[in-house]
Amino acid sequence: MVEMLGVLAIVSILSIGGISAFQKAMTKHKINKTTEEFSQFINELLRYSKDLKRMHTNNETVEQAKIASSIEFFLPSTWRRQYENLYDSMNHRIYPFIRNDQTDVRHKYLSIDYHMPRGKDNTQFCIALYDMAKPYAEVIRKVFVYTKATESEQTKVQTAVWGTIDCKKNRKCLNDITLADMKRYCDTCDNEKEGCSFVLMFRL
């Protein structure tokens, strides 16, 4: 009887371990699939970069409402548009908009604000987004993470990392960041009441 109870206890522990491993594998698969879709979305945006640039006819920011309606036809099949908002398969909200450089209006940038609601996998997902961004270093101006616990709180911006062209002087280069760097930038994502946002700025 005692031996049987011991066997059952071992089976129970192994079952719990198996469930935990399965859950981790499913989370990793979901994150990989979602970042692949996001990369697909970025590729399409950059493909139409000249058209997007023409939308910016003055010094005003082109809001996401105008862009969202223009690009709906190439959204990944698991994404959806709801008014001016885009949502991916994990219900993360994506805000694309175009604006001038604050110091030189001749330069225009496509910004994508990728908002992750509060969740336990945000740090892991944020790290995956940094990895996804690296192949775009030649066309990226900068990448950064920001958090904001409440509407009344000041936005907390993590260290920006820079694309190849803009990585000068003492700036941190996107291609040079390590896993430890990414963890440091992303750690706050799991601690904020309102989640965090991953921002990419592309040169147009």
What is the meaning of each model-derived region?
Residues L14, A65-K66, I71, Q154, ...:
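Alpha-helical protein-protein interaction elements
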Residues W79-L204:
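Intrinsically disordered, low-complexity regions enriched in Pro/Ser/Thr/Gly and acidic residues
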Residues G6, K53, E72, Y87-H92:
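Glycine-centered flexibility motif
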Residues L45-Y83:
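Short, glycine/small-hydrophobic-rich surface segments
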Residues M1-M26, T34:
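N-terminal single-pass transmembrane signal-anchor helix
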Residues S20-H56:
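Membrane-proximal N-terminal amphipathic helix
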